[in-house]
């Protein structure tokens, strides 16, 4: 999860987030090189008295500054499109979870089980135990098996919401009357925190999400106890 004064992204928990972090570094390096070139040109113009007042055209320069930006955009677009297709691709999910946004809580339904569904509300600050996080704790966590592809179907009962887990690289809008789909896959067990990421009313900041990824055996034990 995030911590105070953090400058970078959260630690990657899923293959998608790892790809997003690599793409972030790739794009940042390109932006840094372009910015350095622009600053160099500006400083050269301000510090030198040499000018080319007689130059009417320079086809070589015009060709370069037309082709070079196109190449740079292609270098950014290709990995971006690859990640976009990876995020939409779902192959044989082992589990499907339906998530519904409400004002102001989440409800979850494990569609592969007959009666496994529950609501998830934020725990008020006055009820927190020592070591728990303000505005991030919930009464019912989403328990899922790690290292397996899971399909999350996301919608809303009232207004726009957004189900987001930053460490998984996941943010999917919950839209009334529409069912959006996302893929969840975690490389390791643990607790992963998120929040509603779409302003949805006065209690928008009171819609936390806790995703607990556990080994498959532990998940099976939990699911049996919940039915």
Swiss-Prot record:
Subcellular location: Mitochondrion inner membrane
Stretches assigned to the Mitochondrial matrix side: 46-59
Gene3D superfamilies: 1.10.287.90, Cupredoxins - blue copper proteins
Pfam families, per the entry: COX2, COX2_TM
UniProt EC number: 7.1.1.9
GO CC term (a single one): respiratory chain complex IV
Keyword Metal-binding attached: yes
Cofactor(s) this protein requires: Cu cation
Membrane topology recorded in Swiss-Prot or TrEMBL: Multi-pass membrane protein
GO biological process: ATP synthesis coupled electron transport
Binding of Cu cation A2, residues: 196, 198, 200, 204
Reactions catalysed according to its record: 4 Fe(II)-[cytochrome c] + O2 + 8 H(+)(in) = 4 Fe(III)-[cytochrome c] + 2 H2O + 4 H(+)(out)
Cofactor: binding comment: Binds a dinuclear copper A center per subunit.
Transmembrane residue ranges: 15-45, 60-87
CDD domains: CcO_II_C
Binding locations of Mg(2+): 198
Residues binding Cu cation A1, per UniProt: 161, 196, 200, 207
Sequence ranges on the Mitochondrial intermembrane membrane side: 1-14, 88-227
Gene Ontology terms for molecular function: copper ion binding; cytochrome-c oxidase activity
NCBIfam families linked: CoxB
Similarity comment: family membership: Belongs to the cytochrome c oxidase subunit 2 family.
Function in brief: Component of the cytochrome c oxidase, the last enzyme in the mitochondrial electron transport chain which drives oxidative phosphorylation. The respiratory chain contains 3 multisubunit complexes succinate dehydrogenase (complex II, CII), ubiquinol-cytochrome c oxidoreductase (cytochrome b-c1 complex, complex III, CIII) and cytochrome c oxidase (complex IV, CIV), that cooperate to transfer electrons derived from NADH and succinate to molecular oxygen, creating an electrochemical gradient over the inner membrane that drives transmembrane transport and the ATP synthase.
Assembly behavior: Component of the cytochrome c oxidase (complex IV, CIV), a multisubunit enzyme composed of 14 subunits. The complex is composed of a catalytic core of 3 subunits MT-CO1, MT-CO2 and MT-CO3, encoded in the mitochondrial DNA, and 11 supernumerary subunits COX4I, COX5A, COX5B, COX6A, COX6B, COX6C, COX7A, COX7B, COX7C, COX8 and NDUFA4, which are encoded in the nuclear genome.
Name used for this protein in its record: Cytochrome c oxidase subunit 2
Organism lineage string: Eukaryota, Metazoa, Chordata, Craniata, Vertebrata
Designated gene of the protein: MT-CO2
């Amino acid at each position: 999860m995030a911590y105070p004064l953090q400058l970078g992204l959260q630690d990657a928990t899923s293959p998608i987030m790892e790809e997003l972090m690599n793409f972030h570094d790739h794009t940042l390096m390109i932006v840094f090189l372009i910015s350095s070139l622009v600053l160099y040109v500006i400083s050269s113009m301000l510090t030198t008295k040499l000018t080319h007042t007689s130059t009417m055209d320079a086809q070589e320069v015009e060709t370069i500054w037309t082709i070079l930006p196109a190449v740079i955009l292609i270098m950014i677009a290709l990995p971006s499109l690859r990640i976009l297709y990876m995020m939409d691709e779902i192959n044989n999910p082992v589990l499907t979870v339906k998530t519904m946004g409400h004002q102001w809580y989440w409800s979850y339904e494990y569609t592969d089980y007959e009666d496994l569904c529950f609501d998830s509300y934020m725990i008020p600050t006055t009820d927190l135990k020592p070591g728990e996080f303000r505005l991030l704790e919930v009464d019912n966590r989403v328990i899922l098996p790690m290292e397996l592809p899971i399909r999350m179907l996301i919608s809303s009962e009232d207004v726009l919401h957004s189900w987001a887990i930053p460490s998984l690289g996941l943010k999917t809008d919950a839209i009334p009357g529409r069912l959006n789909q996302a893929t969840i896959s975690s490389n390791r067990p643990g607790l992963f925190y998120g929040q509603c990421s779409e302003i949805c009313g006065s209690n928008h900041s009171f819609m936390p999400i806790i995703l607990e990824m556990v080994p498959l055996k532990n998940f099976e034990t939990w699911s049996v106890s919940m039915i």
